[in-house]
Amino acid sequence: PGGAPCNVLALLQKMGRKTAFIGKVGNDGFGNQLKGALEETGISAEGLFMDGDVHTTLAIVQTKSDGDRDFSFYRRPGADMMLTEEQIPEELIRNSRIFHYGTLSMTDEPVRSATRKAIAAAEEAGLVLSFDPNLRPPLWNTLEEAREQIHYGLAHCHILKISDDEITWLTNEEDYGKAAAAIRAQFPQIRLLLVSLGKEGSLAYYNDMEVCVKPFLHPDTIETTGAGDTFMGSILHKVLEKGLDDLK
């Protein structure tokens, strides 16, 4: 079970960090399964709400012959979309060190406004904000709307993790170094920018450094869904350990 922010939390929890999830699922079999997964993993479900009127959102992932993935969603509406501003646990946010978010909670109201309230609470409390756009085109009315919401996310984060396809689409630049430079120039509060390259590894841009890391390939790999979230969780674990001022 996921989705992306929960996958990040699961990695952090396994690394010994204290984590909590904010979101909404349906009061149905899938929702109860997800709540149970949180509790089993050790992630706090204090910010998890159960909706008796709307079902839990489902994502179906199909692996294609070339190894790429195709996502299908049952979400019109889904319970995750129904989280409201009033349900945001501001005290929980204030007592945290990092707030991690994506754009799946920005596709529709009321969860879009709820996400913005959570971001504002995190900023007011002085947290490090971490953002992974995790673009899923089928969930958006238009890609232009997606671009607008991604720009909102970029304007508020200190750490950005973005995929190779996403950064090329967002900047219209195929050179990752130039694309990263363009984003950092427009959003100068971003301290650490990470580009995941799939089987090619990853790139990191920090201060004036560019770091290229080769992939950890395994011949028996079956499924890569969640690999980027595991990567993100590992990065946040290191940020919690060292801070953003001295990652060298």
Walk through the language-model features, giving the residues of each.
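Structural alpha-helical scaffold elements that stabilize or flank donor/cofactor-binding regions
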Residues: 91-92, 152-153, 186
